[in-house]
């Protein structure tokens, strides 16, 4: 009995350690926009100057009343709704802002959120890190995107010789080839949990192997951008938070200082893949920088070529293609909203397991005891390329093929950064609300 108590005491002490992955997983659970409260933070200071968007008078904000087509999934119907109607019906909305020509056309906050509320933007941070890489490239700290990662982190040569063939451009495009699963399940023993909640990011990187050759295929994972953040720090000799402050937060006239999570106080490696904490208006200023191809009121912060590449539709990864360019997403699949009926739930689950390209928003029982699924991302497939081109009158950006047939990828000029909890920074240099 005494021995049991001794062992239990050791376990309890370990669980109480703040850097313990298991402790954090149990205490904080799944990802939350307030996760920054669980981690040590470094401040991304803003300067004394402020840039402020103009605000359209409330009487002129036509987007408040404009309706657009939106599916009402419970009945499988298409209906017209205002933006307010759509956003108020969703769960856990926080904030939404639409800016056009430096003027706020629409702005809403929900619940306890307001104009000053800051939250963790998760993987939108990846696009911010890409931007910071572009700044370092523009300033000559990074010589070329074809540079090997080991030029900046030489100790990785001893971890795995494949790191010598890993280039910065592979990190930007998610084609690093790392054997790392982006698993958000509440599992404190997963690689993702160890990276996100652990206290030594470099150890995770050094112990990770490669599943395939760098540049070969697109495979999204946060460890890739974690490495990119370290490359930027090594190249500049400046901590991530300080460099982001000097080159972006101060020049862009941010309203508030931001913060970035770090692995722990000893190693101080920034969570460059998910840890930035800011507000929507300041995040919109990053969008403005890209809309102006890296120029901020006459100052070229980012090289315009780097921005153009980031905002250029292209497929990355030879074997598994991704709609991802310099850590920005582009393009959309042509999708159909439809309903599919099944005899039972098991049949439904088996179908979607075999057809991973089809997603559903909702499912419900019908009066006969079967199931109906509302599909919202069912790609419009064609048996051959000719049929596809005829359907779209040859107006298609890219044609791809899977085992289900040929499908189109359209590009309307928009690009976006995306976070796991639905955070989106969308920019479109070609979009005009009024002609």
Feature map (PLM): residue ranges:
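Active-site SXXK
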Residues: 102, 120-145, 171, 228-232, ...
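Penicillin-binding protein/beta-lactamase superfamily catalytic region
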Residues: 242, 257-399, 404-427
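Short, acidic, Ser/Thr-enriched surface-loop or helix-capping motifs
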Residues: 99, 428-429
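Active-site-proximal loop and beta-strand segments within enzyme catalytic domains
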Residues: 76-78, 84-86, 114-121, 125, ...
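Bacterial N-terminal signal peptides
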Residues: 9-18
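Active-site helix/loop module of the DD-peptidase/beta-lactamase fold
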Residues: 139-178, 207-209, 236-273, 278, ...
């Amino acid at each position: 009995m005494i021995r049991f108590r001794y062992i239990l005491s050791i376990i309890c002490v370990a669980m109480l350690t703040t850097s313990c992955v298991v402790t954090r997983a149990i205490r904080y659970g799944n990802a939350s926009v307030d996760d920054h409260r669980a981690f040590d933070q470094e401040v991304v200071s803003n300067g004394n100057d402020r840039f402020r968007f103009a605000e359209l008078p409330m009487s002129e904000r036509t987007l408040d009343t404009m309706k657009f087509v939106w599916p009402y999934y419970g009945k499988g119907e298409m209906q017209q709704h205002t933006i307010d109607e759509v956003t108020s019906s969703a769960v856990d909305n926080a904030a939404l802002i639409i800016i056009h020509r430096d003027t706020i056309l629409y702005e809403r906050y929900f619940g306890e959120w307001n104009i000053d509320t800051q939250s963790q933007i998760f993987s939108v941070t990846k696009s911010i890190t890409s931007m910071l890489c572009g700044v370092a490239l523009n300033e000559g700290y990074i010589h070329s995107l074809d540079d090997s990662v080991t030029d900046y982190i030489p100790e990785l040569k001893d971890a795995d010789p494949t790191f010598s063939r890993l280039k910065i451009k592979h990190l930007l495009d998610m084609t690093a080839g790392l054997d790392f699963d982006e698993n958000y399940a509440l599992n404190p023993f997963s690689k993702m949990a160890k990276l996100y909640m652990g206290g030594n990011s470099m150890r995770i990187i050094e112990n990770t192997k490669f599943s395939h050759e760098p540049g070969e295929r697109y495979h999204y994972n946060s460890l890739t951008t974690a490495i990119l953040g370290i490359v930027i720090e090594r190249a500049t000799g400046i901590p991530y938070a300080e460099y982001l402050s000097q080159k972006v937060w101060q020049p862009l006239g941010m309203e508030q200082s931001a913060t970035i999570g770090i692995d722990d106080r000893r190693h101080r490696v920034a969570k460059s893949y998910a840890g930035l904490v800011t507000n929507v208006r300041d995040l919109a200023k990053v969008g403005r920088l890209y809309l102006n191809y890296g120029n901020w009121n006459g100052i070229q912060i980012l090289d315009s070529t780097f921005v153009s590449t980031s905002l250029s539709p292209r497929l990355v990864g030879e074997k598994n293609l991704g709609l991802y360019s310099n850590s920005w997403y582009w393009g959309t699949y042509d999708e159909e909203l439809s309903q599919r009926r099944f005899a039972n739930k098991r049949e439904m689950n088996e179908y979607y397991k075999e057809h991973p390209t089809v997603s559903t928003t909702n499912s419900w029982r019908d009066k006969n005891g079967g199931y109906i699924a509302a599909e919202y991302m069912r790609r419009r497939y064609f048996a051959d390329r000719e049929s596809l081109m005829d359907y779209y009158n040859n107006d298609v950006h890219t044609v791809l093929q899977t085992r289900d047939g040929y499908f189109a990828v359209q590009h309307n000029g928009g690009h976006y950064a995306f976070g796991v909890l639905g955070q989106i920074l969308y920019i479109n240099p070609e979009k005009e609300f009024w002609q």
